[in-house]
């Protein structure tokens, strides 16, 4: 029997899919759909964290919402816009050594679905609400 996870490093997903800030939103949409990913950290050319895009951000992208022309218009806009135009630049982060209880409280307080895990300036992983659900389900 495995010991119960205590720290972020014990529960996080270490192999994080990231995308460059200059990629088109259509690429982000494809990566998220095909990889069944809901949160995608966005990086600068040097690999440092620049922002985050969620499925909700893609769906509610300001221009798409304003246009309201349906799925065809949405597909066209995803081809035209870059990730940097839809990403959130204020990313809530944590460290691998943060206790899981603190991380969970932070997610609840900030009403967010994930924390990007940084080890120094390097992305070490991602911790999502899905990770917590799995933890509870597995007992």
Where are these regions (language model features)?
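The conserved cystathionine-beta-synthase
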Residues: 19-36, 42-44, 93-111, 117-118, ...
């Amino acid at each position: 029997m495995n010991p119960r996870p205590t720290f972020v490093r014990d529960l996080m997903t270490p192999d994080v899919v990231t995308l460059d800030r200059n990629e088109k939103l259509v690429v982000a949409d494809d990566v998220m759909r095909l990889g069944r990913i809901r949160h995608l950290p966005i990086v600068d050319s040097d690999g440092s964290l620049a922002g985050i895009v969620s499925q909700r951000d893609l769906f509610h992208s300001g221009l798409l919402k304003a246009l309201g022309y349906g799925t065809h218009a949405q597909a066209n806009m995803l081809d035209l816009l870059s990730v940097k135009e839809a990403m959130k630049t204020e990313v809530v982060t944590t460290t691998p050594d943060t206790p899981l209880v603190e991380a969970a409280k932070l997610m609840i307080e900030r009403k967010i679905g994930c924390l990007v895990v940084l080890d120094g300036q390097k992305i070490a992983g991602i911790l999502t609400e899905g990770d917590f659900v799995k933890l509870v389900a597995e007992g």
